[in-house]
């Protein structure tokens, strides 16, 4: 089930909210869990089995890891057993055919592919369970003794499908003791509607340009650049829109989820970009892979190793394809180069450093979206006029004229400027009174326009659902 769908907005969500606020406090997590399982089973019920197995083993091994904390060998065995099951399920569902195909290529064999369907959101909930058991093993959190509460944490539908990757430590107190206020509900509704609008009115519209590019028989350099610009903006509004909706829904239910995006396209370095983009994933790899490997407190050779391991895994986390591996290693190379060579030089040239980051982002997401490594290189070559394409053509100029307004809104919307303007108007004074009237009207208007688009529009799932 999609957040940006009529059944979710006008049937599922209202019913869940009514039931959730009718039941007593001790039943709220049960309602949240059952509704989340229904939400997840809507598309493919059999995938619920994988999630239930992952939750139950995390629950059992979390308790055992805590019980045997004074026995290092036993508690470490619990950690590794849980990790093996979690990662085993993930690898079977997501990477089996990739590894079989690679093995066939290396050996010349023809082992049959398994053609395993990928359960939606498995990468997200696997990382949540892994972090929970690791934190119990480290003694950072107390093991959850109530299976329903732990299952509600993992399966909670606001963040189940595409994050943020919520740490158990961040919301453990809220699982038992959380407050529900009108202020939180209003904030949550506002955040949800804004995220929904980003998804439907910007990401979906930009996706139409991307589809036109991919279906065109012939393209020009201008069209390739339009595609690259549309894709990076589409990906941002698609994913950050989902995160906004997840955070908003979580707040309505009394949970305070971490932020996942902080205007990444204003970054002045690749390092800064990854502090602002998909922050929950970046912090997960930092705390559970990079730092345990030694971080930057090791020799230069080991630091290189740590960087490349983290980014190889980051690429693989996004998908079982050589393009994702290349995408991860692409960032590893430029992060390393920034740290060692030209990072200080970038700090001296403000305009050029922003241009540099945007150019690298465009190239990186061309790789990310490519169907093959060779296709990625062809598109990158075309960006720089090396593919033998004409500079422009009638179709590219048509889309440039047609989408110039959308691009303008999207570019401004990807900066802190709109939020800054709203914040200034919302401060004490006449502006605050005006905003108290204007904001609800604008939000209701956005919801009405989004609803009209959804009634008349085509199916367009969130891009990060496939991860």
Name these PLM-found stretches.
Residues 1-466:
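Membrane-embedded transmembrane alpha-helical bundles that form the catalytic cores
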């Amino acid at each position: 089930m999609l957040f940006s769908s009529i059944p979710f907005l006008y049937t599922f969500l209202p019913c869940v909210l009514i039931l959730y606020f009718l039941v007593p406090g001790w039943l709220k997590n049960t309602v949240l869990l059952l509704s989340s399982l229904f939400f997840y089973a809507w598309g493919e019920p059999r995938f619920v089995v994988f999630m239930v197995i992952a939750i139950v083993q995390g629950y059992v091994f979390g308790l055992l890891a805590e019980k045997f904390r004074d026995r290092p060998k036993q508690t470490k065995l619990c950690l590794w057993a849980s990790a093996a099951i979690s990662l085993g399920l993930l690898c079977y569902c997501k990477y089996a055919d990739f590894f079989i195909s690679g093995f066939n290529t290396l050996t010349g064999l023809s082992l049959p592919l398994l053609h395993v369907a990928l359960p939606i959101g498995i990468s997200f909930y696997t990382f949540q369970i892994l972090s929970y058991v690791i934190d119990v093993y480290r003694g950072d959190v107390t093991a959850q003794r109530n299976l329903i509460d732990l299952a509600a944490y993992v399966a909670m539908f606001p963040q189940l499908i595409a994050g943020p990757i919520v740490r158990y430590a961040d919301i453990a107190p809220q699982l038992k003791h959380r407050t529900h206020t009108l202020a939180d509900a209003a904030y949550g509704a506002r955040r949800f509607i804004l995220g929904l609008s980003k998804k439907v009115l910007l990401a979906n519209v930009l996706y139409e340009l991307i589809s036109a590019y991919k279906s065109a028989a012939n393209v020009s350099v201008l069209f390739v650049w339009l595609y690259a610009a549309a894709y990076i903006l589409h990906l941002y509004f698609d994913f950050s829109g989902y995160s906004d909706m997840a955070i908003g829904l979580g707040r309505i239910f009394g949970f305070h989820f971490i932020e996942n995006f902080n205007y990444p396209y204003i970054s002045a370095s690749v390092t800064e970009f990854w502090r602002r983009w998909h922050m929950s994933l970046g912090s997960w790899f930092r705390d559970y892979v990079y730092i345990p490997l030694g971080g930057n407190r090791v020799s230069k050779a080991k630091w290189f190793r740590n960087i490349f391991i983290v980014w190889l895994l980051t690429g693989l986390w996004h998908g079982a394809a050589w393009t994702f591996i290349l995408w991860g290693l692409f960032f590893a190379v430029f992060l390393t180069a920034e740290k060692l060579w030209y990072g200080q030089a970038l700090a001296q040239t403000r305009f050029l450093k922003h241009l540099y980051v945007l150019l690298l982002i465009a190239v990186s997401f061309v790789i990310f979206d490519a169907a093959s490594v060779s296709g990625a290189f062809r598109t990158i070559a075309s960006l720089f006029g090396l593919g033998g394409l004409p500079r422009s053509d009638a179709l590219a100029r048509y889309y440039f004229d047609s989408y110039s307004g959308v691009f303008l809104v999207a570019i401004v919307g990807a900066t802190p400027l709109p939020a800054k303007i709203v914040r200034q108007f919302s401060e004490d004074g006449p502006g605050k009174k005006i905003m108290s009237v204007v904001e609800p009207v604008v939000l209701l208007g956005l919801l009405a326009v989004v609803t009209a688009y959804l009634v008349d529009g085509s199916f367009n799932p969130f891009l990060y659902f496939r991860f």
